[in-house]
Amino acid sequence: MSVTSTNWVKKWSRPRYRAVVRLLLLVLLASAVAACGGTTEAEGTLPRDPIGTSASTNSDAGKPKKVERCRPGSVKRMGTARTSYAAVVRKRAIAFRQPGKSELARFGRLNINGVPTVFAVLAKRVDRHCGVSWYRVQLPMKPNGITGWIRPYAVNLVPLTTRIAVDLSARRVTLYVRGKKVLAARAAIGTSATPTATGRYYVNQRLIPGDTSGPFGPGALGISAFSEVLTGWTQGGPIAIHGTNRPHLLGQAVSNGCIRIHNDKLARLFRRALAGTPVTVSA
């Protein structure tokens, strides 16, 4: 062996060689433990959760969750100037004057004209867990504007973003969607002898006549209002917003209480205003 080889052996026979060997043994041992499912202290640290859902980084961990509570029997208004709700009867519904007291009327899935029975939802009564126990709704019956209470399981709730305003003095019908005016139409209204009833109502039925060139035009939006004069009429004299075959009379007080608008405007209104849409008729 050369001198150089001898020096190499002597050099690595020193304590440095023994330290390197011990280090290699530790590395091999750590690898073996990790392969069996163990971890070193560094490997046991969880990575940071980028969306904040990890228990190790969630500042709310361990805190009791807040449970919403309501005063049993409290009534909360539903709807705003931009949104409202309709209740569509599933099979049958019973309306009460007060929750569970004094039955007012019974309704089937379809009304007398064969279209779905719909109510306008005004408020809800809640239990202590804030669940809905009753809906206060406007009913499509006399007297005008009558309300009642129905069970939530009897109906399907439908959100709406449309609203109709009828200004009798201006002879105008306006449609709003999410609070924005999207359509305005000149209207013919009831005469002084057969006036159009004022108040807050809703679209309770959408009807397409057999003859779309007749006095009702291409369609009619029945509202939950009735003539207060023509009480002997069929179905109690219901009021509707409909088209006309006499457009030259628009802007005048010539009807029996219904609100007539141009057929083109009616077609657009009919497409947008679903059943349950609030309707305000002002003098």
Segments from the language model and where they lie:
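C-terminal motif of bacterial Sec signal peptides marking the signal peptidase cleavage site
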Residues: V33-A35
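Bacterial signal peptide processing site
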Residues: G37-T39
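Boundary regions of SH3-family modules and the immediately adjacent low-complexity/disordered segments
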Residues: G44-R82, Q138-V166
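Exported/periplasmic cell-wall-interacting domains
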Residues: L46, M141-K142, A154-R163, T191-Y202, ...
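Beta-loop motif signature
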Residues: G52-D127
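SH3/SH3-like beta-barrel superfamily modules
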Residues: N111-Y153
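A structural motif detector for short, solvent-exposed N-terminal "entry" segments of globular domains
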Residues: P152-G190
